[in-house]
Amino acid sequence: MTRIKRGSIARARRTKIRFFASKFRGSHSRLTRTIIQQGLRAFVSSQRDRHKKKRDFRRLWITRLNAAIRAIGVGYSYSASIHNLYKSQLILNRKILTQIAISNRNCLYMISNEILKSGV
């Protein structure tokens, strides 16, 4: 069998990796080993932070919703309103409720009154 020289293939692979790391600083964009390590680290960080973003936004929605609900009624909390929301079988998630609370406080007031009136 003939010998296969992989110079062009290896160069193409490294060029592709370098293109991804061209935005990095210092040796992280110049040295192949470091580029590979930093690339893996970047992918791990991006995946981790995508999941973290979901948690952060849920926390933000809950905080905003709690503040809006407490402003509406005395002694009425976020947890009680979400519990009553599920009992009355209304299909509104936290994101939608928060958008309603920010844009139209009266609408949120009407929704919470309906939930309390149903008294399931």
Swiss-Prot record:
InterPro entries assigned: Ribosomal_bL20 (IPR005813), RIBOSOMAL_L20_CS (IPR049946), Ribosomal_protein_bL20_C (IPR035566)
Keyword flag Ubl conjugation: no
Any Pfam family matching the protein: Ribosomal_L20
Example of a GO biological process term: translation
Subcellular location(s) of the protein: Plastid
One MF term in the entry's GO annotations: rRNA binding
Residue ranges that the Swiss-Prot or TrEMBL entry lists as coiled coil: none
Signal peptide per UniProt: none
GO cellular component: plastid; ribonucleoprotein complex; ribosome
Chief location of this protein within or outside the cell: plastid
Keywords attached to this entry: Plastid, Ribonucleoprotein, Ribosomal protein, RNA-binding, rRNA-binding
Record PANTHER family: 39S RIBOSOMAL PROTEIN L20
HAMAP family xref list: Ribosomal_bL20 (MF_00382)
Family the UniProt entry places it in: Belongs to the bacterial ribosomal protein bL20 family.
UniProt name for this protein: Large ribosomal subunit protein bL20c
Species in which this protein is naturally found: Cuscuta gronovii
Taxonomic lineage: Eukaryota, Viridiplantae, Streptophyta, Embryophyta, Tracheophyta
Gene: rpl20
